[in-house]
Amino acid sequence: MKFASTFAGFFATRRENGGTQTSRAVDRLMRPADSLRELDPLLIWSATGLLLIGLVMVYSSSIATAEGSRFTGHQSHYFLLRHAMFLAVGIGAGLAAFQLSMRQWQRFAPWLFLIGVMLLVVVLIPGVGREVNGAQRWLPLGPLNLQPSELMKLFVALYAADYTVRKLPDMGSFRRGFLPMAAMILLVGFLLLGEPDFGAFVVITAIAFGVLFLGGINVRVFALLALVAVIGFMLLIWLSPYRRDRIFGFMDPWQDAFGKGYQLSHALIAFGRGEWFGVGLGASVEKLFYLPEAHTDFLLAVIAEELGFAGVLTVIALFAILIHRALVLGREAVKLERYFSGLVAMGIGLWLGVQSFINMGVNMGLLPTKGLTLPLMSFGGSGIVANCLALAILLRVDWEVRQLKRGCGA
């Protein structure tokens, strides 16, 4: 609440696209060609640590699956090589994204959101979208598969920030401020539920509503609609038999350990076997065809088994540092009247925070099973590329903030 009121106070004074003469002058001078060593070291090292740990653990958790599958050609390095390739593509895309100023990202935001919606429509077309395990979430692009919902998380963070800046005078109005954005999110949610991808819908809703809240939307309106959203999500769960089964399996996984509670029970076994320092890297038993999706949704359970409580605590600490730096960076950008930049940074922080919290909660048995990967770490090309793009934008915000501080002080 204090965060929101603070940012609302800043937003009430000036808008991003207006700016000051000083910020415009500095903007003309800013080129990402030098001073890169000034970038936030905590942001860089926490993100690098998560990406590297993820690469190692994806390999460790996927060896048995790769060796036992004809799809992979029985090659033990299959998922490692693909994950490394996705990382290389993501880093390359991130380097390109870093070259764009935040003013350019603001101009692109509505178009990126529109492209994301179009991709979500295309993936639902029979014969176009690829179906895996009953979910039609992927667009086949030759040897690769694109998952539009992963890119949409980034696009929503950008669009929500741009929308908030443009609609700043109307943020206190339900009809003019909140309703148009809510309609867009409901459209996205309708398309995501058609795949179905309930988890992505939850994360995207959290990003959009969180950015609106930090941007100064009427608190009473926000509280009322947050309650409506929670009730709506509960109804969606209750009206869907397979989602309802997940709730029952979550409440007592051991009652049906070979059915509804299978994934959760084996995740808990992995956590129990790991104890304080784990059974050793590569020595997991649960990844040997006991724990489904060991290299994606349940990667943290394998980390817990092989590296123990110490490994899990390290991962949590790295995420906490990264998310904290994103939120602090957003606040600093707002203080310098870079409101779009600040909201984007905080939106990315919310995205990584909400998704990692849900994934960790599922792995630890604190939340019902949900098809969400661990950001920056789990196997998945679209997710890794989207995460790298988000990190590049965070670094761009950080770089521009540092340049503005230096320019204003000159």
From Swiss-Prot:
Where can this protein be found? Answer: Cell inner membrane
The pathway entry for this protein reads as:
Cell wall biogenesis; peptidoglycan biosynthesis
List keywords of the entry alphabetically.
Cell cycle, Cell division, Cell inner membrane, Cell membrane, Cell shape, Cell wall biogenesis/degradation, Glycosyltransferase, Membrane, Peptidoglycan synthesis, Transferase, Transmembrane, Transmembrane helix
TM spans (from-to): 39-59, 78-98, 108-128, 177-197, 198-218, 221-241, 303-323, 342-362, 374-394
Q: Which domain of life is it from?
A: Bacteria
Q: What is its main location?
A: membrane
GO terms (BP aspect): cell wall organization; FtsZ-dependent cytokinesis; peptidoglycan biosynthetic process; regulation of cell shape
Topology with respect to the bilayer = Multi-pass membrane protein
Enzyme Commission number:
2.4.99.28
Catalytic activities: [GlcNAc-(1->4)-Mur2Ac(oyl-L-Ala-gamma-D-Glu-L-Lys-D-Ala-D-Ala)](n)-di-trans,octa-cis-undecaprenyl diphosphate + beta-D-GlcNAc-(1->4)-Mur2Ac(oyl-L-Ala-gamma-D-Glu-L-Lys-D-Ala-D-Ala)-di-trans,octa-cis-undecaprenyl diphosphate = [GlcNAc-(1->4)-Mur2Ac(oyl-L-Ala-gamma-D-Glu-L-Lys-D-Ala-D-Ala)](n+1)-di-trans,octa-cis-undecaprenyl diphosphate + di-trans,octa-cis-undecaprenyl diphosphate + H(+)
What would be an example GO MF term here? Answer: lipid-linked peptidoglycan transporter activity
What's a GO cellular component annotated to this UniProt protein? Answer: cell division site
The task this protein performs is described as: Peptidoglycan polymerase that is essential for cell division.
Record-stated family: Belongs to the SEDS family. FtsW subfamily.
Q: What is this protein called?
A: Probable peptidoglycan glycosyltransferase FtsW
Please tell me the species this chain comes from: Aromatoleum aromaticum (strain DSM 19018 / LMG 30748 / EbN1) (Azoarcus sp. (strain EbN1))
Its ancestry begins with: Bacteria, Pseudomonadati, Pseudomonadota, Betaproteobacteria, Rhodocyclales
Q: Which gene encodes it?
A: ftsW
